[in-house]
Amino acid sequence: MQKDLRIVIIGAGMAGILAAIKLLENNYKNFTLYEKADQVGGTWRDNSYPGLTCDVPSHHYTYSFERNPAWSRYYSPGPEIKEYFQNVFKKYSLQEYTQFGAEVKSMDFISNQWHIGFADGFNEIADVVIGATGVLHHPKMPDIAGIDSFQGHIFHSSKWQHELELGNLNVGVIGNGSSGVQIVGALGGECKSLFHFQRTAQWMMPLDNGIFSSEEQVAFQDPKIMNEAMQFDEYFDAVNRYSQALLDMESDGAKEMANICKDNLIENVKDVELRKKLTPNHRPLCKRLVWSSDYYPCLLYTSPSPRDS
């Protein structure tokens, strides 16, 4: 690598942090990591809604060189993931190369260099720009007639208002992708009434999210035991089967996953009318699957009302 190249990294989420670490590993220090927020973490910083959980196994949602034996569950809750990336950031002293509150507003490629403009008027020139901005950091509010005149509280899931007490409020959740389903599963029984508005029903894959005991967490500090726990062959086989199922709806994997989704709905939702509302009009895997073992029980035991919208 030419040592005189000026490098800029935009975004201090998991990709930006990794890029900075790898530059330092190669003894390259002529770079700056720019982050528009006041702390690192990317999507795990921006999202903090109730029930936030990763649908990738905890031990696989880490850098290969920074294993974390302290995960509390097989699928980690959002706050733990945020803490993990913040700890890695500190361990590698990346704060020395980072500027917070620096939002990029423009980039122009002039004479083989990037001319970068920031929201505060600052300008930077770089030979190389590594874009690590992600795609989910600009909340999209639905365009609903009358939304501007709504007199109650309204906010996007990525801007959760934790100071708001929901116990005596009627709450409506719009959307039934992963975020909406996780929120409803977490809010069941926590508010006066709960309504879930869905445009189309979703197929649900059960998510067995076991808790790691303190003994297991201690054992995971042994690299050999950690490698055994990660079950690389089984995990990547499952990933490959899922990918193949998406490409071939007639494959054995696709049929198996479809049957799991259908059985999950039948076994957990006995009410015929409610089951009709929750049955999609498309085959499983036509859309990205939602993974949850909390949603159906929440509907049954806390009586949130799914509404088509």
Question: Can you name each region flagged by the protein language model?
Answer:
Residues 301-309:
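Single conserved hydrophobic/aromatic residue that forms the stacking wall/gate
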Residues 39-62, 206-216:
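Conserved N-terminal glycine-rich FAD pyrophosphate-binding loop of Rossmann-like flavoproteins
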